[in-house]
């Protein structure tokens, strides 16, 4: 499922003394089956774009096209409902949205809300809970009895149970320890390998380098760079000026260049660095 934004602008609280422009004439494509990352400083417009992708917001001007279905300023909620089923949005700290009395019921709620039978919803819930690493002995537990990492997995399973074609992740590993972050990113990688389109908002440049195949860089509501991670992370000075930084490996390689060691193309992953050091 592909997504296209055409001349999209968004203004919060439009027509009031408190209005603020969040996005300015955004044009972008998210290709079917891609793993697209959005990076930018706080207030750059990343989260606003995420909420436009599944119709949580509608554009003030312009068109958001999801699988050839258009969302405009005039779109009604009932017209957007099918888009929300196909574009799953995982907020920061999604565990805050848990509410049912058991893990299984919480994950099954979403599919039932979209008209799936209780039996099929439970089957989907079991399947997705297993996929995110929640063991069956936890299914009848109250979600709030689980650890923070387990609660987040349950919340993500709830989104996956609605069988989205696109998964939008807004800082999905925020607050997790390195082990939990790695495990969660591995789950998303496997989903992408299975054919799902992944959209990631993150401030962790190593994750962008290791997982994404395309990157948009936002600043003050505008796209200032776009391209493959390898190309984007060659712009070390610009990214550091925007307080975004680069992958750790890239930063190390840049220091070597600054000391006179010739490196024609800065590596962005550990594997690439090994190749550079091996072959000179």
UniProtKB/Swiss-Prot annotation:
Keywords associated with the record: ATP-binding, Cell membrane, Membrane, Nucleotide-binding, Translocase, Transport
SMART domains with a match to the protein in the record: AAA (SM00382)
Gene3D superfamilies the UniProt entry points to: P-loop containing nucleotide triphosphate hydrolases
Chief location category: membrane
Domain of life per record: Bacteria
E.C. no: 7.-.-.-
Subcellular location: Cell membrane
InterPro entries: AAA+_ATPase, ABC_transporter-like_ATP-bd, ABC_transporter-like_CS, ABC_transpr_CbiO/EcfA_su, ECF_ABC_transporter_ATP-bd, EcfA2, P-loop_NTPase
Signal peptide (UniProt feature, chain positions): none
Pfam families, per the entry: ABC_tran (PF00005)
Topology relative to the membrane: Peripheral membrane protein
Residues holding ATP: 40-47
GO cellular component terms listed in the entry, alphabetical order: ATP-binding cassette (ABC) transporter complex
TM region positions: none
Subunit structure comment from the entry: Forms a stable energy-coupling factor (ECF) transporter complex composed of 2 membrane-embedded substrate-binding proteins (S component), 2 ATP-binding proteins (A component) and 2 transmembrane proteins (T component).
UniProt xrefs under PANTHER family: ENERGY-COUPLING FACTOR TRANSPORTER ATP-BINDING PROTEIN ECFA2, HEAVY METAL TRANSPORTER
Family per record: Belongs to the ABC transporter superfamily. Energy-coupling factor EcfA family.
Name of the protein this chain belongs to: Energy-coupling factor transporter ATP-binding protein EcfA2
Gene: ecfA2
């Amino acid at each position: 499922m592909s997504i296209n934004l055409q001349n999209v602008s968004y203004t919060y609280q439009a027509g009031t003394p408190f209005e603020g422009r969040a996005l300015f004439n955004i044009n972008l494509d998210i290709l079917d089956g891609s793993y697209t990352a959005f990076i930018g400083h706080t207030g750059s417009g990343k989260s606003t774009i995420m909420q436009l992708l599944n119709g949580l917001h509608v554009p003030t001007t312009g068109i958001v096209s999801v699988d050839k279905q258009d969302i405009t300023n005039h779109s009604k909620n009932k017209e957007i409902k099918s888009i929300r089923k196909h574009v799953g949005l995982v907020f920061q700290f999604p565990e805050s949205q848990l509410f049912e009395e058991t893990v299984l019921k919480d994950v099954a709620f979403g599919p039932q809300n979209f008209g799936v039978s209780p039996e099929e919803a439970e089957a989907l819930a079991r399947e997705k809970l297993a996929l995110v690493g929640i063991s069956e002995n936890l299914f009848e537990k109250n979600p709030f009895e689980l650890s923070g990492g387990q609660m987040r997995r349950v919340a993500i399973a709830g989104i996956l149970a609605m069988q989205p074609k696109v998964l939008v992740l807004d800082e999905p590993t925020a607050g997790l320890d390195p082990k939990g972050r790695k495990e969660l990113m591995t789950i998303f990688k496997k989903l992408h390998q299975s054919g799902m389109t992944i959209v990631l908002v993150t401030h962790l440049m190593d994750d962008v380098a290791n997982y994404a195949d395309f990157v948009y860089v936002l600043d003050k509501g505008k796209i200032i760079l776009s391209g493959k991670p390898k190309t984007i992370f060659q712009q070390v000075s610009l990214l550091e000026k925007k307080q975004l930084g680069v992958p750790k490996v890239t930063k190390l390689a840049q220091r070597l260049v600054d000391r006179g060691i010739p490196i024609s193309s800065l590596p962005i992953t550990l594997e690439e660095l090994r190749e550079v050091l091996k072959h000179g």
